[in-house]
Structures are given as C-alpha cells and as structure tokens.
Amino acid sequence: MAEKMPAIVKTKPAYGAELVEVDIPKPGPGEVLIKVLATSICGTDLHIYEWNEWAQSRIKPPQIMGHEVAGEVIEVGPGVDTINVGDYISAETHIVCGKCYACKHNRYHVCQNTKIFGVDMDGVFAEYAIVPAQNAWKNPKDMPPEYATLQEPLGNAVDTVLAGPIAGRSTLITGAGPLGLLGIAVAKASGAYPVIVSEPSEFRRELAKKVGADYVVNPFEEDPVKFVMDITDGAGVEVFLEFSGAPKAFEQGLQAVTPGGRVSLLGLFPREVTFDINNLVIFKALEVHGITGRHLWETWYTVSSLIQSGKLNLDPIITHKYKGFDKFEEAFELMRAGKTGKVVFFPHKK
C-alpha cells in the first residue's frame, strides 16, 4: 500500500478546502484503519467549507473533512478485539465519554463531552481513514456502500420521524434538503399518510415527490398553513417534522399542527427565534422533541433494518456520485446552490 493518499482538507481558516496528498494514518490503541469505499457530504461539511460562524468557533485547520462513511477494515490497532480485518463497517461519528451524567443515564446521544470526527479530529474524506473501534458499526456484506454511508444521517431522520407514533398519522415536513428527503423516506416507510412537504426549491420539491411525498407546496407562492388545512379538512396535521431551520417554516408548522399533536425539530435555527409560544405551543398542548445525534445503538439497528427491508426509497435521494475527489469543489458548490440531494464520493477510482 502507498504511503500517501489524496484527502479533502480544510487547510486554512477561510472559505473552501483543498485536495492535498497526506500520509496514510496508522491506527493507535482502540482504533481501526479503513479503506473508504463511500463517503457522503453532510450539512456540517458544508458549514466547514463555507467557514461560517459555527465553523470558525469549532474547527482548527489543517484538518481532513468528512464524517459519513462506509469502508473495509484493513488494520486494527492495539487492544481492539471487537472488530476484525475484513469487516465492512460504517461509523457513529459522535465519540462519547461514557462517564458523564448523560452517558450514565444511557443518553449517549447527548454526551456532555462529545467529540466528532471530521469536526474535532481528522475525518473520512480520504482514501483511508481512522475510526475508533467503539464507533464502528458492522454492515451486512450485501449493503451497497452508497446506502451504508447514509446510515449516520438516516439516524437523524429516524429519530426525528419516530420520536412518537407515525403510522397512519398526517404529517407535515418543512424542508426537503438531504435530511428532509431522508425524513420523507422514513415517514413513508413507517406508514405516515398523507405526507405533506413544504419546500421553496422546485428541484427539491420534485425530489420530494420521487421519494414519496403525497403533497408538496411552495411556501413562497402558497400559504402552507391553508394548504395543510384544506387537505386535512381543517384539522391540521398530527405530526410536524421540521428539517429546514427556517424560522418562518417553524412558525407555519406550529400553526398547521393539530392541538395535541407532535413536533420534532432537527433543523438548526438562528440563535434567536421569535414566535407566539403561548398560543402555538402551550395552549395547543403540543408534544415537542428536540433531535440531535442518534440513540446508541438503538437507532442504528432501526436504520439498518429499514434499509434491509427494502422499504426505504433512497435512490432518488442520491443525486450525485463521484469517483475520486477531483470534482469535490463542484460537488460543494452544487450543494450550496441547493441543486443536489445526497452527494456520495467513491474515493478509489478503480
């Protein structure tokens, strides 16, 4: 094996990234080295690429980007006895301490000392990558790599959709970006009906329909609240799933959900959002869930089972596939323009 490899690196504290040759790492204690078979772009990667306020406060260049991955284990470090060379894995990207109050109460997804690879350490946008053995998830050998790399973001969607009953429930989804599209797929696979999607991008509305949305609405051209009320005979939806992080969409969703309904929030908002909490939440007795990370490891079992069931319509969501990283800038700019679903890299061109 060569000693060097290409990797997408955040080389400096500024917009963009670079494709550079870096050393192939060696696994340390408790780590495994994987040959990256597929890796996909997340919204977090886009924030790092754009060098927004959050990225500036968290990222310390130079650093290899990326955290969604599927790969084959080719070397194990000292002390690793749960993962073997040849295993086909994906990875939970939240490295938890196991010692804090949250972890000791089995709430690992909100560990108070969470570290994330591709954020707090080198990531997986490379031909080879290090994964902590405790974070490795063994995949079925017949799962396509482009599906296996999506399990981490699918976990976000699963926790959002399945935070409460969904089968047979009328559902509004705001935002049909990559995570919203995964949310549509999970909602449909779980029996939600009708699934109504509010999304301003025509490209993404068309993707939403391909994934299985029963109704789509452009909130810039129609009132989505009236749209929902017309469909539900004035009752409102039983479930509101927020993926956009847009304050206006959030408010419209609260208006559209029926009293006593359920709200799950995954989209990240500006720090301050103003809305009528008394009339839109308290007096409506809404059940509100904030969603972050994935429950370890319950969510992963659910995600893997959903994929293996064949009920998840993932193919329309994967809109762009690249062999190698040569066109990574094109991929990021397309994502910035809202002209993609999920983007998947296959690092090894052969």
From Swiss-Prot:
Zn(2+) 1 binds at residues 42, 67-68. Binds 2 Zn(2+) ions per subunit. The gene is tdh. Pathway: Amino-acid degradation; L-threonine degradation via oxydo-reductase pathway; glycine from L-threonine: step 1/2. GO terms for biological process: L-threonine catabolic process to glycine; protein tetramerization. InterPro entries: ADH-like_C, ADH-like_N, ADH_Zn_CS, GroES-like_sf, L-Threonine_3-DHase, NAD(P)-bd_dom_sf, PKS_ER, Zn_alcohol_dh. GO terms for molecular function: adenyl nucleotide binding; anion binding; L-threonine 3-dehydrogenase activity; zinc ion binding. Belongs to the zinc-containing alcohol dehydrogenase family. Its EC number is 1.1.1.103. This is L-threonine 3-dehydrogenase. The active site is at 44 (charge relay system), 47 (charge relay system). CDD domains: TDH (cd05281). SUPFAM superfamilies: GroES-like, NAD(P)-binding Rossmann-fold domains. It is an enzyme of class 1 (oxidoreductase). Zn(2+) 2 binds at residues 97, 100, 103, 111. The lineage of its organism: Archaea, Methanobacteriati, Methanobacteriota, Thermococci, Thermococcales. Catalyzes the NAD(+)-dependent oxidation of L-threonine to 2-amino-3-ketobutyrate. It holds the Pfam family ADH_zinc_N. Keywords: Cytoplasm, Metal-binding, NAD, Oxidoreductase, Zinc. Its cofactor is Zn(2+). NAD(+) binds at residues 179, 199, 204, 266-268, 291-292. It catalyses: L-threonine + NAD(+) = (2S)-2-amino-3-oxobutanoate + NADH + H(+). Homotetramer. It is found in: Cytoplasm. NCBIfam families: PRK05396.1, tdh. Its main location: cytoplasm. It comes from the Archaea. GO terms for cellular component: cytoplasm. It comes from Thermococcus onnurineus (strain NA1).
